[in-house]
Amino acid sequence: MDTAYVRRFIFSLCAFSLLIFLAGGAEGQTIFSSTAWQNPECGGSALGDFDNDGWPDVFRTECRGTRVALMHNEGDGKFADRTGDIQTAMPDKLLGYGQTFADYDNDGDLDLFVAFGNWNYSQRDRNLLLRNDRGVFTDVAQEAGLTDVNATDNAVWLDYDRDGWLDLYTANLGQPEVRNLLYRNNGDGTFADVTAEAGLDVSFSEEAGGSNGALAAGDFNDDGWPDLYVAVFRARNRLFLNDGQGRFVEITSEDLGDPGQAFDVAVGDFDNDGDLDLFQATGGLSQEDRSLVLLNLGEGEFLDVTEAVGISVVGDAQDTGFGDIDDDGDLDLTLGQPRTVFRNDGGIFVDITDQAYSGDFAPPVAFWDYDLDGHLDGQGYRARFLNNGNGFHTLQVELVGIESNRNGIGARLIATTGELEQMREILGGRGFNQDEMVAHFGLGERAMVDRLEIRWPSGQVDVLTDIPADRKIRVFEGHEGYYPVKPSVWEAILPDSLVAGAVFQGTVAVHPALFEPGAEITRVVADLSQVGGPEEVELTAAGDGVYRL
């Protein structure tokens, strides 16, 4: 098994760092407490653990001043700004606003696609594909074949041919001749434009051939193949079903939406009937522009149930997301604009904005568990939102594909607890934000998941039974059982400064987030190059995860 390499800065003493090598093998309380980001003026976000330390990080785009921000989760509720690590890869005019993590090369770490993101077509430029090599990002878009110059504003990862390699679909705004593009992953680090042969050489409007709205890829007709939903700004929204033979076929559904100002989209099974429903957030101020709750009827048919489920949003709706923020077993709904939080009460949505959080922030529109307590935290425009919990139980599941793509994008998980059955599908982004690629199940007062079925894109089906609640587990495709997920823990005892000629002895306790089953630490080294020492000094093992220098 290949050696995995994880780098984490743990000492504030100059630039002293450790490198570690792993061998594979209450009543009245609001739901969220909010904390403003250091750079609050940002737009979209992608959530994921880019350095494999067990703590999810965030990449933010459309930021004032820096354009983008890469924030590293320190594991103590704080985030360190790592934007400088990727700043040199960013074109001068890039805004971002369309970003998604995924392990496109199946090497075990999250790579990052960043859409150019400028809505001015005359200032279009290239997109970025940032390959992650042990926590170091390098733009490889040109060598990977992603050379088209467009005003791309969002993208999704999917494995449309189910060959185990993630493909990419991009939304491109602009002139009538512009098209959205589908890139097939060749499995060798390169991509090929297969838009035409896949049946997607489609003009979405007379003014702009591309969609200029949110995208979502998911299995909308329950046949095991990922389909495409395309929200179109000022034109009809579209649904393309995957025929399993390499082509997409457009399905006409009247209730998918009139030609309004479609913006973002939320995807999830809000009625717990086992299929993917949609919430289409739509801008504008007319009745034509109202947002839509679209109930999946199967076979590509959707029913507009917006008023029936208690939602009436007409004015300028933008970013949105589904997540079970109260852990009761059904998906709640949030809107960044207008600022609204809806609680799902058995299929009826109730506005609980005033009870959800306090502070002068828009609510969260993407979801993750950044403090690893099992409850869904939120990410918004200007702030992150810590879920205070309510005593209900949860289960979180992280997938690792073997025959399927590494992230398990496209996999379906069905959790059964007594009479409660919930379905989650791992998505490779959606719209202008990306949720953490971890399936979260709120269980209410239930303390055990009776049965967990995982349907992988490869066709493999794994079944686990009798899983205790209140934990995060990792499931490897085709392996029996599951593995508990534990984050990295680092403890160091160091002097305040180094003195020339003096003897220095350091001790560090290392308990990393080992990724593979049976993995173990092979060695720990210190990089002293920025304090006048060598680049690599091996520490001596003292037992129980303790190493000395």
Tell what function each PLM region has.
Residues 12-21:
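Bacterial N-terminal signal peptides
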Residues 26-41, 72-94, 130-150, 183-210, ...:
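Blade-edge motifs of beta-propeller repeat domains
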Residues 32-37, 348-485:
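Gly/Ser/Thr/Pro-enriched helix-cap/hinge segments flanking short amphipathic alpha-helices
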Residues 42-52, 72, 96-106, 152-162, ...:
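Beta-propeller blade termini
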Residues 55-62, 112-116, 168-173, 228-232, ...:
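Hydrophobic beta-strand segments that make up the repeating blades of beta-propeller
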Residues 64-66, 118-121, 174-177, 235, ...:
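Short glycine/acidic-enriched loop and turn motifs that connect beta-strands
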Residues 69-71, 126-130, 179-183, 238-240, ...:
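A short loop-to-beta-strand structural motif that recurs across blades of beta-propeller domains
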Residues 478-549:
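Glycan-association/targeting regions that enable binding to alpha-glucans and other polysaccharides
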